[in-house]
Amino acid sequence: YGEIRFDFNLGTNANPEDQYFLEMYTLADKNNLIVQIHPNKGQLPVLERLLKKYPNVIFLAHVMPDVKKEIGKLLRTYDNLYYSLDAEIHYIYGYQTIQDNKGPTREEYLKFIRKNFDSLLKEALGNWKQIIEAHPNQLTWGSDRWYTWHFDPEVGGLVTEFGRTFIGHLDPAVQENFAYKNAERMLQDR
């Protein structure tokens, strides 16, 4: 179905429960579609209401690093919630709180990730390894991209290296699920 983003840093963000979106979810529910959702801070209760109301929709949430524990609780409760780990663990959109909604340059990112690769990997594993291993069928690796330079081969190679290294540190019993099988299953079940 596509991604619905509710956390733009400019202007007023849309409400995931606006009638416009409810009609989309209803259509997705009738047709067993996947909706990737990028909630804003404070919208976790809204996400839970949507999970309850639309049980035939797979909600693929991502970039909610401030509510990791709560995501774990929702994963235990709702089979129709999946979570994609991507930009939030390799900082492709920036490593400062807000970089004026434009992120770092290609050169700044490459320098930052190379310099901090090991510490970022340790941080990512500390934040997510336990959650992934507790919910081995609902989390998946992603490679979220936005800015033009995100598609640069050198950047893509480094993001891939980070992802593979991260996956290599997970329990071998969950590595394939997280790397690709959960995504395959999510798509095949549709």
Give the residues covered by each predicted segment.
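Active-site groove signature of glycoside hydrolases
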Residues: 1-12, 31, 140-141, 145
